[in-house]
Amino acid sequence: MGVKILGTSAENVDAAEDRELFDEILEKCQIPRPKGHTVFTAEEAKKAANELGYPVLVRPSYVLGGQGMRIAVSDEDVEEYIGVINQIAQEHPILVDKYLMGKEIEVDAVCDGEDILIPGIMEHIERAGIHSGDSISVYPARTISEKAKETIAEYTRRLARALHVV
């Protein structure tokens, strides 16, 4: 059609959503992350959860806004949540990650291909992982230390560069 689409390439958006590719990027960027597994069935999910130790975060891959994300504390929870996830994203894998108690932080960043501007680091009000897509956040973050904000900003810059975010 002759129309140039500006922005991050589809390949890099896919890399951000693909568990294995994103893990490779995090490794290259030296960014820590909780242990996790990619699974396809309830049995695999329960096995992964037991290996990681409860609680775990169970969520579909390739779903925006935290839809279908649940914190599981037992095999029964995993079984129930897999049923919900399969209704939302049947053709995609399921991610089972060790749940880390803490705060959920959201970062907005703008990049022109070279310079990266981080206008805000927001702090979610609810417990991490509960309502990621519809939660309330506050800016500026109220209880995040300056050191943590600096680390978050540095990790954001590393990821923006690695993913060629534009």
Task: Report the location of each language-model feature.
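N-terminal beta-alpha lobe that positions the nucleotide/phosphoryl donor
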Residues: 1-166
